[in-house]
Curated annotation (Swiss-Prot):
The gene is ubiD. GO terms for biological process: ubiquinone biosynthetic process. This is 3-octaprenyl-4-hydroxybenzoate carboxy-lyase. One of its GO terms (molecular function) is metal ion binding. Its cofactor is prenylated FMN; Mn(2+).
Amino acid sequence: MKYKDLREFLTLLEGQGELVRIKQEIDPYLEMAEISDRTLRKGGPAILFENPKGYRMPVLCNLFGTPKRVALGMGQEDTHALRELGKLLAFLKEPEPPKGFKELIGQLPQWKQVLNMPSKVLGKADCQQVVLSGDEVELYKLPIMHCHEGDVAPLVAWGLTITQGPYKKRQNLGIYRQQLIGKNKLIMRWLSHRGGALDFHEWKEANPDKPFPVSVAIGADPATILAAVTPIPDTLSEYAFAGLLRGQKTEVTKSISNDLEVPASAEIVLEGYIDPNETALEGPYGDHTGYYNEQEYFPVFTVTHITMRRDAIYHSTYTGRPPDEPAVLGEALNEVFIPILQKQFPEIVDFYLPPEGCSYRLAVVTIKKQYAGHAKRVMMGVWSFLRQFMYTKFVIVCDDDVNARDWKDVIWAITTRCDPSRDTTLIDHTPIDYLDFASPIAGLGSKMGIDATNKWPGETSREWGTPIKKDPNVVKRVDEIWDQLGL
């Protein structure tokens, strides 16, 4: 099923028992995060807090708190179907011309989906039913959550930030946390390699001292939200990919105060600019690592206009030690990564980012090993092929007889097939998430690759061990009599 807007999606979730409305008064200060955390950890539903303490606007949390709801948001029934999306992205990343008529016919479904990529611009949109400007702009009237006791201030966590560089035709959508520091001021925390930060950097070089236009959409339709967190090719717009997910063009409308296009059905849109000369100290905040992060200076987003739907819904989340919503998203989107990696490295059988690895910091890869040194090539490929794995600290490579998603299997492979001196690869002075305080320098640290594969001639001078295998005839015989044994 496809959803035109967030409200359609919520109606579907409620019909499936995947959304609960809470009518009791709940405080956005700490209480909503505590309730959301407990609900997510038990695999519970999305939550609509209808009576936030001190506010009139309802708050939506835990929307993508299970892999099933992530898949539903992408128009699929379960996460296994997300591999088909990964195949489509792999095709779009490096399309190959058909080698014959039969192959051309086989590619027609993919090209048909591409027809849904261009967005549709509306002159009148629901997201602009209410328009606030000037002194009417008051961010403190939004029920922005304060998630952890040690957090410095309330935090906008699910805003889709829309930017455009001076030399790019496409607009970029990214999700960056934004600290509330004034009635019309937010701190825009974006890492230097992210699309919004790159657009801003190019703008500053091309337009010194001129304000950089920014719009932030809160509560967009699920396809657009998820497009912003999916590893799409750099040349593809998130709006275009949302159209592919939805099976129909993404509807957008021009912002009131700038030329940026925003999701037409968004619940709330913040419009404004970033002054290249204005920064503020951001944090500390409890983050997806399970720790409070260090403080750092980031640009300040000045909000000049707020537009919204009548009876708008504020969409929010919290981050903390896994599992949290980003970890669940990472677990589901793991299935999207696999076909993209396999297109470049066909020897990869499976690829897994364990949620407890803070979404992306550790990866387990299983391969059909073909030559000595193969595991190291795959390590280097994972670190370099997709920008999403720039910050992955640990890559463990195993043979295809190991289940990448079973820690018992992976640990067995490491302890029996790996010599620490020979089979660990250390790389110094590589990019690391600045939130990773374990690195000696903020933003710069090391990576480790672990080769837990069986060793080939040239990799060892010893005779390699032969794994124990059960006699299939005995296994079959015991299967037949098992129920009679009373065990």
